[in-house]
Amino acid sequence: MGQALGCIQVDQSNVAIKETFGKFDEVLEPGCHCLPWCLGSQVAGHLSLRVQQLDVRCETKTKDNVFVTVVASIQYRALAESAQDAFYKLSNTRNQIQAYVFDVIRASVPKLDLDSTFEQKNDIAKTVETELEKAMSHYGYEIVQTLIVDIEPDVHVKRAMNEINAASRMREAASEKAEAEKILQIKRAEGEAESKYLSGMGIARQRQAIVDGLRNSVLAFSESVPGTSSKDVMDMVLVTQYFDTLKEIGASSKSNSVFIPHGPGAVRDIASQIRDGLLQGNSAAE
């Protein structure tokens, strides 16, 4: 109705392209405008100045021959001061942007291996944005921001990557477990060594106490019973220890059966053997 009366409304964040007899005349700002249609004035079309978003999926191959799908998100808008170029120079803005994105991604990703592609996705996005900005500025468009939102490897490659990561985790866990067992064994060995050391110290003190006791017993008996020699006292002590040993073996419930001579003559022989062994040991030491 308004156009029939020669008036037109342009909404906010939009501009209208005015033509006179098919030739560009001016860009109409938001508001109400009079168009004398009888003089050949008309609106050729409207152009939105809002930020628009285009998601582009580009399949390409990395340097290590892995096929990936790179998903790029392009945010762009038409410039009000270049509305004429934006309206007339491009017939399909989205297809044009998509073509530039394909070109830049397929030129950048094949230079990188798969891991580097993930690590340098911000650099790829910056390269795409720079190239798009140079190209689209000639057509009256501004590239607001470019994001690489996803990098999708082939399904089989993704499964293999997950298996590699799982194997790496298991290897680390096994290494940590082995290290823990190693530390445990070291600590156990240190504990056993300390235990044996303390046990040895106890045995040494026990034997020293026995030697001291025997020496005192021999001296006391020799002084109490005149006419006895040290040899007689040692024979008696050895016989006493012999019977004490038999008593301990018989008293223990876990002892094995031990068959040894235990008559008086056998005791004398054992005492003689022990005494001779001590004398030989002393001679060897001297």
Swiss-Prot record:
Q: Which GO terms describe its molecular function?
A: protein histidine kinase binding
Q: Which SMART domains match?
A: PHB (SM00244)
| Subcellular localization, as worded in the UniProt entry | Cell membrane
Per the record, what is one GO cellular component?
A: plasmodesma
Topological relation to the membrane, as annotated: Lipid-anchor
InterPro entries, per this entry? Band7/mec-2_domain, Band_7, Band_7/SPFH_dom_sf
Lipid addition (N-myristoyl glycine) is recorded at 2
- Any keyword Transmembrane? no
What positions belong to coiled-coil segments? 156-190
For this UniProt record, the keywords arranged alphabetically read as follows:
Cell membrane, Coiled coil, Lipoprotein, Membrane, Myristate
Q: What is its main location?
A: membrane
- Quaternary organization: Self-interacts and forms heteromers. Interacts with AHK2. Interacts with NB-LRR class of R proteins (e.g. RPS2 or RPM1) before R proteins are activated by the effectors.
Report the protein name in the record.
Hypersensitive-induced response protein 2
Q: Can you name the source organism?
A: Arabidopsis thaliana
From which lineage does this chain's organism come? Eukaryota, Viridiplantae, Streptophyta, Embryophyta, Tracheophyta
